[in-house]
């Protein structure tokens, strides 16, 4: 596969699964720097520590995944994905196991650090799609088909309170078959 610039996708993508896929025998920092080590590169430990701090795990960098809660593990997986610093990022339900406040904070962080990149975000949360998406597609049917894109106004991350009262939110809910009022 190649992009519209003709260059191959290999080495240009990062992926975050809805499961954290952390290696249980590695510390938090070692999980975050895993990609560099697998490529034979020297890990940027300073950047890893900065990302761990930004996701609220700066004091847990030496801990193994088994000692972390589900939400902490998800934050660690997000830090690992952001550490890859790739132009194309695939994210499958990256915020699903987080409490509401942490979810909003990490959505803001992801929007900041992934600006100007191509991100394919899979989510079942209409609010999340509207906060973070430039173009939102709803898949439905069997076999699944993509509907026409919804393009919300403004730049991500959009304010959650404003999104919940927006016409775009009502439109997205209608496309999902959930009535018209948030």
Describe each model-derived feature in a short phrase.
Residues 139-171:
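Conserved beta-strand-loop-alpha-helix hinge in the C-terminal portion
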Residues 26-33:
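Short coil-to-helix segment of the ABC ATPase nucleotide-binding domain corresponding to the Q-loop/switch region
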Residues 78:
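Hydrophobic anchor residue at the start of the ABC signature
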Residues 64-68, 72:
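Conserved ABC ATPase signature
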Residues 83-87:
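A short, proline-enriched helix->beta-strand linker immediately N-terminal to the Walker B motif
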Residues 43-60:
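Conserved ABC ATPase "signature" region
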Residues 89-93:
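Catalytic Walker B motif of ABC-type/P-loop ATPase nucleotide-binding domains
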């Amino acid at each position: 596969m190649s992009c519209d610039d003709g260059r191959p996708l290999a080495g240009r993508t990062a992926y975050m699964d809805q499961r954290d896929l952390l290696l249980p025998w590695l510390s938090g920092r070692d999980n975050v720097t895993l990609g560099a080590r697998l490529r034979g590169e020297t890990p940027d430990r300073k950047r890893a520590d900065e990302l761990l701090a930004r996701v609220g795990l700066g004091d847990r960098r030496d801990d193994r995944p088994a000692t972390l809660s589900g939400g902490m593990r998800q934050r660690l997986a997000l830090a690992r994905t952001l550490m890859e610093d790739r132009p194309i990022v695939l994210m499958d339900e990256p915020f699903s196991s987080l409490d509401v406040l942490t979810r909003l904070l990490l959505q803001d962080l992801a929007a900041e650090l992934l600006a100007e990149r191509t991100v394919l975000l899979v989510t079942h949360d209409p609010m999340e799609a509207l906060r973070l998406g430039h173009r939102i597609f709803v898949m439905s049917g069997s076999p699944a088909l993509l509907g026409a894109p919804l393009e919300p106004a403004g730049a991500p991350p959009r304010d959650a309170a404003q999104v919940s009262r927006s016409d775009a939110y009502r439109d997205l809910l209608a496309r999902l078959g959930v009535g018209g009022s948030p």
